[in-house]
């Protein structure tokens, strides 16, 4: 495994054709502080620009996957908090692969609890797998926060009612990995949990076996289809194929 640029809050590396972006604040349940928010944009760009990387896996260190903003830490840095608030209000978030326009396939390998803003990384990944120890919840409403971005993202990929139930029930609605699989939030549950990274690497390598430009085109066409009607989606796919020559 090749370790890439040094980061304070992330571990970024490459194993064969697979790039790894690991949230690395395990003592804080991998919550996003000001440093991580800045580093995520750089790390996604680094992996997307690396010609040796064909697929990216995103996971967490320790027992948590990702638990959203570290509001305690950000409260100590008013300028950083104001900047994040400004970006949120303008829908200019820059921490997931989708936010940063990453063209390569991204697999979210959810190793533990995924809460609040952490759901962005599930909603915006191209493929999501989870260990049997993973769980999912959106506690925003329970703490008086009005944040629907994560659940809007999830509603593009799975049935509407369970997403609405998560949003309204807050901390009282925690989905197990198996329940998330049943609802279509994840496509695979890995048991035992300690095999998650091995399974993620194997899946990523199977995807990386294909031509990078074709992977990027297929990814783009399918994401664009979520914002179009059926006929428009077909026409868009044909146009993309013609553009590719």
What are these regions (language model features)?
Residues 63-67, 115, 137, 222-225:
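Short, active-site-adjacent cap segments at secondary-structure transitions
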Residues 221, 232, 236-245:
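Intrinsically disordered, low-complexity segments enriched in small/flexible residues
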Residues 45-48, 71-111, 151, 157:
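An acidic, glycine-rich surface segment that forms the CoA-thioester-binding/catalytic face
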Residues 1-20, 24, 167, 172-209, ...:
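Amphipathic alpha-helical segments at domain termini/boundaries
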Residues 21, 58, 70, 121-123, ...:
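Hydrophobic/aromatic residues within transmembrane alpha-helices
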């Amino acid at each position: 495994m090749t370790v890439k640029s040094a980061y304070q809050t992330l571990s970024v590396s490459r194993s064969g054709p697979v790039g790894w972006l690991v949230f690395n604040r395990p003592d804080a349940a991998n919550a996003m502080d000001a440093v991580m928010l800045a580093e995520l944009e750089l790390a996604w760009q680094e992996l997307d620009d690396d010609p040796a990387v064909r697929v990216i896996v995103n996971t967490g260190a320790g027992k948590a996957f990702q638990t959203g903003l570290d509001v305690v830490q950000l409260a100590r840095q008013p300028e950083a908090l104001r900047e994040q608030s400004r970006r949120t209000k303008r829908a200019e978030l820059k921490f997931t692969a989708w936010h940063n326009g990453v063209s390569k396939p991204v697999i979210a390998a959810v190793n533990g609890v995924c809460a609040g803003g952490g759901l962005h990384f599930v909603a915006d990944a191209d493929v999501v797998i989870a260990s049997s120890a993973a769980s999912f919840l959106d506690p925003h409403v329970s703490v008086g926060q009005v944040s629907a971005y994560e659940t809007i993202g999830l509603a593009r990929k799975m049935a509407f009612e369970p997403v609405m139930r998560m949003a309204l029930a807050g901390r009282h609605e925690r989905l197990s990995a198996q329940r998330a699989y049943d609802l279509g939030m994840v496509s695979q549950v890995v048991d035992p949990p300690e095999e998650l990274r091995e399974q993620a690497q194997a899946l990523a390598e199977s995807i990386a076996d294909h031509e990078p430009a074709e992977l990027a085109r297929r990814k783009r066409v399918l994401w664009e289809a979520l914002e179009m009607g059926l006929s428009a989606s077909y026409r868009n796919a044909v146009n993309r194929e013609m553009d590719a020559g």
